[in-house]
Structure formats: structure tokens, C-alpha cells
Amino acid sequence: MLVLTLGYTATIWGTVGLRQWIVVFLTFCAAQQGGGATEGWSMLITGALVGLLGVPAGLYGNELSLRLGLRTTALAVFLASALANTLFGFAAMLSYGTAAVLALAAGFLVQGNFSNLTSGLLAVAEPWQRGTTVAVYSCTGFAGGFIGTLLFGLALDCFGGTARLAAWVVAFGICLVGAVATG
């Protein structure tokens, strides 16, 4: 149960950077290309879609887990999301449209472990302890979200702010650190 709980913490840590900062990052991407005003609504829509992709991503991750096994699926999703988060900071060097499409792809990948880890946890928990088990599991996930968001923001500030590519690369790299440290 500890491994599944830490895996969930890593999943939330790795997800919050993308989900919480996507609109600001896309604003930066548009500004890098000399745009901004015309992409305004698409930034908000892309941000909303990244959040909504958690549902099908979680379902797909759970289905893969049933077919390939929880360990194999969780590891594959961790590696794919670590790679996606690490490289996503560099997306600002691409066109705004490409960055938005990559945001959707990364948003899907990083949320792929939600359901399979939760169902795996419930499968191994004692029936009379499931409520407490899920409560602790949720609290550690939220702690990962808090720490990940805080460190993401600190990385942005320490490396020059939201108007610098290096700051975004380091901040998205923080998502990788969370996955490696707890996963």
C-alpha cells in the first residue's frame, strides 16, 4: 500500500505543474511568438481541456493496468509523464499551436495513473480499513500537489520569472523530481 500511496503522491506532484500553470505557460508561448491577444481564448480552452483529459486518461490507464498489470502500466506512465514534463518546458521554442497540442498530449499522459493506482490500492486494502486507507492516500496526494505547486512557483521565481524560458524548463523539471523522488 505504501508504494501505491507514494505513486499517487508522485502522480499528483507531476500533474500539478502542468494543470496549474498551463494558461500562464501558453501566454508565455504566445508572447514568444509575438502573439498573445488572438490566442487568449484558446489558452483558456486548452487549460480546461488539459484538466478534463484526466477522466479519459485515468480510465485508459486503468484499462491498460487490467491488461498489462499495474506495475508495468504505472512504470510506463511514470516514465512517459516524466519525459513529457521535462521536455514540455522547451515547447515555448515552438509555434503556439504546437505548444498547445503538446499541452494536450502531456496533459493526457501525466494524468494516466490516477485510476489504476486508486483501484490497485482498494484491491489490496483490508475491507474494514478502506475508508482510512483512502483518506491517507488522498492526503498524501494533496501533499504532493501542494509541494509540487509550491516548488514549481519557487523555480519560476528563482530562475527569472514567467517571462524566461529557463525558468519554465526548470519548473517543469521540478515535476520530474517529484516523480523520481516519490515514485
Question: Residue spans of the language-model regions?
Answer:
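Intracellular helix-loop hinge segments at the cytoplasmic ends of transmembrane helices
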Residues: 24, 116-124
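Helix-to-loop junctions at the C-terminal end of transmembrane segments
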Residues: 56-70, 156-157
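A membrane-interface helix-boundary motif in multi-pass transporters
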Residues: 36-38, 154-177
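MFS 12-TM fold signature
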Residues: 80-85, 175-182
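Extracytoplasmic gate region of multi-pass secondary transporters
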Residues: 2-55, 148-149
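A late C-terminal transmembrane helix in Major Facilitator Superfamily
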Residues: 124-160
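C-terminal transmembrane helical hairpin of 12-TM major facilitator-type secondary transporters
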Residues: 69-117
